[in-house]
UniProtKB/Swiss-Prot annotation:
GO MF: ATP binding; glycerol kinase activity
Biological processes per GO annotation: glycerol catabolic process; glycerol metabolic process; glycerol-3-phosphate metabolic process
Function of the molecule: Key enzyme in the regulation of glycerol uptake and metabolism. Catalyzes the phosphorylation of glycerol to yield sn-glycerol 3-phosphate.
E.C. number: 2.7.1.30
Pathway(s) of this molecule: Polyol metabolism; glycerol degradation via glycerol kinase pathway; sn-glycerol 3-phosphate from glycerol: step 1/1
Binding-site residues for ADP, renumbered to this chain: T15, R19, T271, G314, G415, N419
Similarity comment: family membership: Belongs to the FGGY kinase family.
Record InterPro entries: ATPase_NBD, Carb_kinase_FGGY, Carb_kinase_FGGY_CS, FGGY_C, FGGY_N, Glycerol_kin
Protein name: Glycerol kinase
Length: 505
């Protein structure tokens, strides 16, 4: 049995910040440290990060969480990584430096290119990758960098470039450049991975004109990849720690919520909103605008999921605060929403960077419908929170159709899961029970569980289940006819934003 004074260290690299968390054997979070990094918007629809800044902030969070907790690096059993997916970095193998900023998952610069493929090609890509051709995924971002950064194609030809999503970049840096790997969940989100062979796909590489030699080796989500370099924690500290997990953030939340059985669903409310349902070892093809994705993997097995990705969720609340300036902070939104009824039927469609699942419309843009002279700030705040729910419900409804079964319970996490108004409205609209765990750090816990299983810190899923505690459960308070009326208004509103950019140009 592992010593109880040993801990798991998880690096949670998100869209706006890098975090480090220390977990004990009972699943308690001992300490958390967070460092924000800069968002770059060089052109309309473009979103970039500085990969060096990401590394520096992640390393800073790692060192600070150890200092803050008083835990020595020698007490860390192993390190796991969970990360924002799809964000693409290409760096020079000889210098270790990026040749361009990391292009973020939200970036839309390749939207026009994604419209150039014929129906047969789109179907081939979906069949092989489980995904659709969309700017969201890494493949078109990688192509853009290779095509637009001077000399990039030549350097790739000479074998001097390396591509990775953020997990690969961090593992490379943490190991001092010794290890160049990714995991099944992150690899699959590139558009370059075959979900049937669980390897890079030559046809997809050819389609996007991406050389195989720049790609990392694919490993499972739960195994030892290598060790941290000497001096990572401080100049005099030569401790080397195992890196034993890598998993995309949404898949990590699914595992952290212990949705380990087929049909179990989790909803994460972060910058975007991401809904996954476990389909076990079965690859389920969606006919309703969802993605087939890898849920998680071990050395001997790969598990799959259906996923719906909503581009704007918590970011809509940031928009209320930072752009419209009608709330001072996110916490206030719950109070404002409770001040008014929904009888004015105001709808906000926050498609600021297009619509994700199940619509997949890169040319939609945000809109507010149903305004009249009586509309107040409270109505707009309420409608913005409701929009997060409506978008999540569109995905849940598609899952019901693809799975051909009801979804009666889903587990929630993420910052907005603390908003009781939003969670009750989610239960109402989806006509399902909503369960929120006491430990809201489910994304970090998923990676921690993966690490623990890899190194024997936890023996099996039954041990993991003992760490899960429920904070609250909510059940629907509206009837189905009432809900149907509200959803009808949402459907009209969202459809009126379709193809907006295309139609006005």
């Amino acid at each position: 049995m592992t010593d109880s004074k040993k801990y798991i260290l998880t690096l949670d690299e998100g869209t706006t910040s890098a975090r480090a968390l220390i977990t004990d054997k009972q699943g308690n979070i001992i300490a958390v440290e967070q460092s924000e990094f800069t968002q770059y918007f060089p052109k309309e629809g473009w979103v970039e990060h500085d990969a060096i800044e990401i590394w520096n902030t992640q390393r800073s969070a790692l060192v600070q969480v150890l200092n803050k907790s008083g835990i020595d690096p020698s007490q860390i059993e192993a390190i796991g990584i969970t990360n924002q997916r799809e964000t693409a970095v290409i760096w020079n193998k000889e210098t270790g430096l990026p040749i361009y900023n990391a292009i973020v998952w939200q970036d839309q610069r390749t939207a026009d290119y994604c419209q150039t493929f014929d129906k047969d090609t789109l179907e081939m890509v979906k069949q092989r990758s489980g995904l659709i051709i969309n700017p969201y995924f890494s493949g078109t971002k990688v192509k853009w960098i290779l095509d637009n950064v001077p000399n990039a194609r030549q350097l790739a030809k000479e074998g001097k470039l390396m591509f990775g999503t953020i997990n690969t970049w961090l593992i490379y840096r943490l190991t001092g450049g010794e290890v160049f790997v990714t995991d099944h969940t992150n690899a699959q989100r590139t558009l370059l991975y075959n979900i049937h062979t669980n390897d890079w796909d030559d046809e997809l590489l050819k389609l996007f004109d991406i050389p195989r030699n720049i790609l990392p080796e694919i490993k499972s989500c739960s195994e030892v990849y290598g060790y941290t370099f000497k001096g990572l924690f401080s100049k005099g500290n030569e401790q080397r720690i195992k890196i034993a997990s890598s998993i995309g953030d949404q898949q990590s939340a699914l595992f952290g919520q212990l949705c380990l059985e087929k049909g179990q669903v989790k909803v994460t409310y972060g910058t975007g909103c991401f809904i996954l349902t476990n389909t076990g070892e079965e690859i389920v093809k969606s006919n309703h605008g969802l993605l087939t994705t890898v849920a998680y993997s071990f050395k001997d097995k790969v598990y799959y999921a259906l996923e719906g990705s909503v581009m704007i969720a918590g970011a809509a609340v940031q928009w209320l605060r930072d752009n419209l300036r009608i709330v001072y902070n996110a916490i206030e939104t719950e109070w404002y929403a409770d001040q008014v009824k929904d009888d004015r039927r105001v709808y906000v469609v926050p498609s600021f960077t297009g619509l994700g699942s199940p619509y997949w419309d890169s040319f939609s843009r945000g809109a507010i419908f149903g305004l009249d002279r009586g509309t107040r700030r409270e109505h707009i705040v309420r409608a913005t929170l409701e929009a997060i729910v409506y978008q999540a419900n569109d995905v849940v409804d598609a899952m019901r159709k693809d799975m051909k079964k009801p979804i009666e319970i889903f587990k929630v996490d993420g910052g907005a899961a603390n908003n009781k108004f939003l969670m009750q409205f989610q239960s109402n609209i989806s006509q399902s029970k909503v369960i929120k765990p006491t430990n809201v750090e489910t994304t970090a816990m998923g990676a921690a569980f993966m690490v623990g299983l890899a190194v024997g810190y936890w023996e099996n899923a039954e041990e993991l289940k003992k760490t899960y505690k429920v904070h609250f459960e909510l059940t629907p308070e509206l009837s189905k006819p009432e809900v149907d009326k509200l959803i009808k208004g949402w459907k009209v509103a969202v459809q009126r934003t379709f193809k907006w950019v295309e139609e006005i140009e």
